[in-house]
Amino acid sequence: IIGNLVSKGLPSGRANIAVTIDSKVLQYSFSSAAKTTVKLETDEKWNDRHFIYIPPREMFSLFEGFIGLSSKREISFDQTYINLAHALALPVLRESEDNPLRPAVELLERELQFKVLQMNGRFYIQTESGNMEAHLVAEGLRKLASILYLILNGEINANTILFWDEPEANLNPA
């Protein structure tokens, strides 16, 4: 129930959220009694923006078969995980010299010392030693690999607004 996010001690009993980026305003609100509905007030200028949400639990190791399972069965994952699985399902874009995020990809691959591959619906981490299944890699590295793959497949681009819940979780220093 979305209303549980509203502090019960607020005099109005409403949550009001406003985001302004590049003179584009997005506002929404909901009451402490709301179950699933929010009141959305937005500029049409937001229609050209793409949003992606990275939930606290990583999706990389759960990916294989997740979309099929979630479409046919009730599962205990909310829609944000299903949306992320659909975003991860897309293949990588053709390599382009004019991609503004190319330097970010190169930096991530250099610092992480791996590349990310998807083969037959399963993710792999490719190092100099070979390919390793994603579920065998530390959770923090899987989160970073997800971000890297979302850049490679175009789901994160120069116009994407990234919401990353608990980005610091499991990103322990080596």
Predicted regions and their residues:
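Phosphate-coordinating catalytic segments in nucleotide- and nucleic-acid-processing enzymes
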Residues: 1-159
